[in-house]
Amino acid sequence: MLKITKLVRSWWADFKHIPKIDRVWLSTWLIIYITFIMLDVLTPTFWGSSLLKYAGIFLCVIYAYKKYYDDSKLIIALFLTFLADTILVWTHYYTVGVFVFCFAQFMHFLRQTTLSKRNLGIFALVISGLTFYNAWSGGVLIYSLGGLYAMLLIANVVLASRRYKREQKDFKARCGWYGFMLFIACDLCVGLRYIMLDGLISARSLPLVAFLVWVFYYPSQVFIANSSTHKESAKGRNIAKSKAIS
């Protein structure tokens, strides 16, 4: 109970330090989040829920572009996430969608790691080589890509956790840790959903698991959009000042 109380106090302390413009963004994100959760509960098949989710992910890209204009890796990672969602939500090219998600996770890895370019290149070649060798030798490509995605996500969780331990008072470091923990919770639900659909375990809880995917996923992207390793750009500061004056 004490840990929960401490966590809530930490969240409240974070909220008090959010500039006015960020509170406007936060309110927008919360409205979208609460609305699509209510729609999923009351009318699970309504297409408007998917549209709201899609718009919410796109807003994360816009937010990062405005606030952290100089952090190109974060912006690209969020845009690739949005692109992957576009492919997975609106098309049947699931393998392509997972492939784009792998690139998104790799961009997050790039922005968090301290590896040299040489070691980073070796890492990328080894991981990619193992993945495509598995697919070429008879494995199913989407499963190989899923394995690559899982390795990159776990690496990002580890890097975010290390950053959080180093910089516990840094709001952005905490956002990164919260974001990637929620991300992995989301993907555990995705994995469980596919296991249920394949008939390996009972599908009795399938609607709940499918619901939880977005309960975890959407806030993960909001937190990650606030986890830049860069300082707020001059462009973002100028926007915040103009909003505060008005």
Task: Please place each PLM-identified region on the residue numbering.
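Polytopic alpha-helical membrane-helix bundles and their juxtamembrane interface segments
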Residues: 2-246
